[in-house]
A protein has these predicted regions:
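Catalytic beta/alpha-barrel core
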Residues: 63-70, 75, 84-95, 131-137
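Alpha-helix-loop-beta-strand connector modules within alpha/beta enzyme cores
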Residues: 39-67, 73-76, 103-114, 136, ...
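Glycine-rich anion/phosphate-binding loops
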Residues: 2-20, 45-48, 91-96, 132-138, ...
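Non-cysteine beta-strand/loop elements that form the S-adenosyl-L-methionine
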Residues: 25-31, 87, 107-116, 159
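Alpha/beta enzyme core
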Residues: 10-29, 59-60, 64, 76-85, ...
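Glycine-rich, proline-tolerant flexible connector loops at the mouths of alpha/beta enzymes
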Residues: 2-6, 25-52, 161-167
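Active-site mouth loops of central-metabolism enzymes
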Residues: 1-14, 39, 64-66, 122-132
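Catalytic alpha/beta core domains of metabolic enzymes, predominantly
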Residues: 124-182
């Protein structure tokens, strides 16, 4: 996206193919920046940004393509062009229908912890016990995903390093990442 965390991501298709050549197994593509402070992007704009990238990658490689979106319309369009994984920074909270779509298609789903919306998520980075809070949130989202028909082996949890957390919270989560939802 034009306002991504990482300037290098703006190369899209060519960068993805270079990373695959260098051994990447999964390429994550997003049409809406979810960095702290980012502005909302419409589903139509997300689709316009990501579909050419997906098409070019899929034409050249069988590497898994993950799509970073919170919108059902976007993942539908992406899967129809060959995307394999839903990476939802809202952990299936922002769009009620996205979980049913993922279950129906049998695609893996990444559920990420964050606080609030990207535009303001860094405004509240204090936690009583960051590990317990993030773990409890992710466990509740896993339960929700299961209740919507997503298979247990298709669910991946992401503690959301850098999303609504300060340095110390990030350090604690990285140190204990293997214990999440355990």
């Amino acid at each position: 996206t034009p306002d991504s965390f990482w300037e290098g991501s703006r190369g899209g298709e060519d960068l993805a193919l270079k990373l695959i050549d260098e051994g990447a197994d999964i390429i994550d593509i997003g049409g809406e920046s979810t960095r702290p402070g980012a502005a909302y992007v419409s589903a139509e704009e997300e689709i316009r940004r990501i579909i050419p990238v997906i098409k070019k990658i899929r034409a050249a490689s069988s590497a898994a393509i993950s799509v970073d979106t919170r919108k059902k319309e976007v993942i539908e369009a992406a899967v129809s062009e060959g995307a394999d994984i839903l990476n939802d920074v809202s952990a299936l909270e922002d769009d009620e229908d996205i979980a049913s779509f993922a279950a129906e298609k049998g695609i893996p789903v990444i559920l990420m912890h964050k606080r609030g919306i990207p535009a303001i998520m860094q405004d509240n980075t204090s936690y009583g016990d960051v590990f317990r809070e993030v773990d409890a949130y992710l466990a509740s989202r896993v339960s929700y995903a299961l209740s919507r028909g997503i298979a247990p082996n298709k669910i991946i949890v992401d503690p959301g390093i850098g999303f609504g957390k300060d340095f110390e919270a990030n350090r604690i989560l990285i140190k204990n990442c293997g214990k999440l939802c355990g």
